[in-house]
Regions:
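Extreme N-terminal leader/targeting segments of oxidoreductases
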Residues: 1-21, 39, 436-440
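N-terminal Rossmann-like FAD-binding beta1-loop-alpha1 element of flavoenzymes
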Residues: 21-45
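Flavin-dependent oxidoreductases
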Residues: 32, 189-316, 329-340, 345-353, ...
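Glycine-rich FAD pyrophosphate-binding loop
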Residues: 39-58
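Dinucleotide-binding Rossmann-like beta1-alpha1 core, especially the glycine-rich loop
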Residues: 62-140, 257-260, 267, 274-280, ...
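Short beta-strand to alpha-helix junction loop
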Residues: 75-78, 104-114, 153-171, 181, ...
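Helical element adjacent to the flavin cofactor pocket in flavoenzyme catalytic cores
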Residues: 152-209
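C-terminal catalytic lobe of FAD-dependent flavoproteins
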Residues: 315-436
Length: 443
């Protein structure tokens, strides 16, 4: 189940004259940030042009994984998975959270060596990650035996149902006194004496001391209107879910060309690991040089489409006045069509790797746009030149699992608390200060 612009509006709090913090974007990062801010006694308003979890936050795979993470992300996601576990008991709603493990199957010695190289990092954080032999994979993964050389496995990794989890957090935020308004685009920010003093929404002005921009695929466009350059592109990812299915694995697994996650409804969420698509547009050329290393490393897994950038087609404007209708109001929810080729690739992958699932109907298929930075790790930082404006974006397909941890990080930044983690890797300035590009593990 996903949310789109036909989903009934569920959160329609009146706009206040003043709050301490306005959060732009009601995805998992924005809602989690607001949740932790409110826990600290801060008054907070979350505005979203569309719906809570309307874009990637209801469309992702539902994985909550430590395994395979970037070294700088890992301590944050360790905090995050523990937060997901505590939230599951605290929210008074079933969000489908469970720890059933993440498994990356390897079909040859080269993949085994790649996975083994990550064990050192796992050991530094006392994770329960280990390598499985071929026989151990067959014991856990009830597919065709004998097709795997081994696997990397982290039993403590988990999953949750995205379409349940983020709205549940939003409802909890409201119970604590936080405000949420769907269908309310923030057009711009206001400044006074050199720092943030408020926001202009389509419904009026709201005064505040700080703003957190957690706009996902839209963050770069919002900043462009402020003459701030954020190198961020989008990738279309297609996902499907099956009818109830035999239990071939209780957790999440990458089986070479296909990924599976057991769902709470006894089906599987399915994705193809090689069918992400980037629609080449003006921003692609604008940021081409910064993305060259990522393109070189991911050419096997990323398809380029030359029929025009999707966001470019939807949002030809890059600048607007505060009293003008913005691109955010023209496109309430970014709701791309799923790729027919990607769905076919999933079918082929299942037939090859998990034939027990191959003939099951896909009861729903959807797509989402993933916000990707040049080094495939997020930005979590204050925006240079705009004191009081904070940015949390570019989670590059990793946002759902790390959501609560990233929300806590952003709340600490806004409140001026010493960060619990080293955030150097996530500086906004790394794209402009000559820092060497170091790629993260990928989408």
């Amino acid at each position: 189940m996903i949310f789109d612009d036909t989903t009934p509006i569920r959160f329609q709090d009146a706009l206040p004259d003043h709050v301490d913090v306005v959060v732009i974007g009601a995805g998992v990062i924005g809602i989690a940030t607001a949740w932790y801010l409110r826990r600290s006694g801060v008054s907070v308003l979350v505005c979203d042009k569309g719906r809570v979890a309307g874009e990637q936050s209801s469309r992702n795979w539902g994985w909550i994984r430590q395994q395979g993470r970037d070294d700088a992300e890992l301590p944050i996601v360790i905090d995050s998975i523990n937060s997901w576990e505590s939230l599951a008991g605290e929210l008074d709603e079933d969000i489908g959270f469970t720890r059933q493990g993440v498994l990356f199957a390897a079909q040859n010695d080269e993949q085994m060596a790649e996975y083994e190289s990550w064990l050192k990092l796992a050991g530094e954080y006392q994770l329960d990650t280990r390598m499985l032999s071929a026989a151990e994979v067959d014991e856990r993964l009830h597919t065709t035996p004998g097709q795997w050389r081994g696997a990397l496995f982290t039993p403590s990794d988990g999953r949750a149902e995205p379409f349940k989890a983020v709205p549940a957090m939003a409802r909890s935020l409201r119970k604590q006194g936080g405000l949420i308004r769907e269908g309310c685009a923030v057009r711009s920010v206001e400044t006074r004496a050199g720092r943030i003093s408020g926001v202009v929404t389509e419904g009026g002005r709201v005064n505040c001391q700080s703003v957190v921009l957690a706009g996902g695929a839209w963050s770069s466009l919002f900043l462009a209107n402020l003459n701030v350059n954020l190198p961020q592109l989008t990738v279309r990812a297609t996902v499907a879910r099956t009818a109830p299915a035999p239990d071939i694995f209780a957790g999440n697994a990458i089986l070479d060309e296909v990924a599976i996650r057991r769902r709470q409804d006894s089906g599987y969420t399915i994705a193809s690991s090689g069918s992400n698509e980037h629609f080449v547009g003006a921003d692609s050329f604008r940021h081409f040089l910064k993305y060259t290393p990522a393109l070189a490393s991911s050419w096997r897994y990323l398809r380029l489409r030359f029929d025009g950038g999707l966001l470019d087609r939807l949002t030809p404007q890059r600048h607007w006045s505060d009293d003008a209708t913005t691109p955010f109001e023209h496109t309430r929810v970014l709701n791309p069509e799923p790729s027919i080729k990607a769905l076919a690739a999933m079918r082929k992958g299942l037939a090859h790797r998990a034939p027990q699932l191959a003939d099951l109907p896909f009861v729903e298929a959807w797509a989402g746009m993933i916000d990707v930075t040049p080094d495939v790790v997020p930005v979590m930082d204050e925006v240079m030149g705009y004191p009081g404006l904070y940015l949390a974006t570019g989670f590059s397909g990793h946002g759902f699992g790390i959501g609560p941890g990233a929300g806590r990080v952003m709340a600490d930044l806004v409140l001026g608390r010493p960060p619990a983690h080293d955030l150097t890797r996530f500086r906004f300035g790394r794209f402009s200060d000559g820092s060497p590009m170091r790629l993260g593990p990928g989408l």
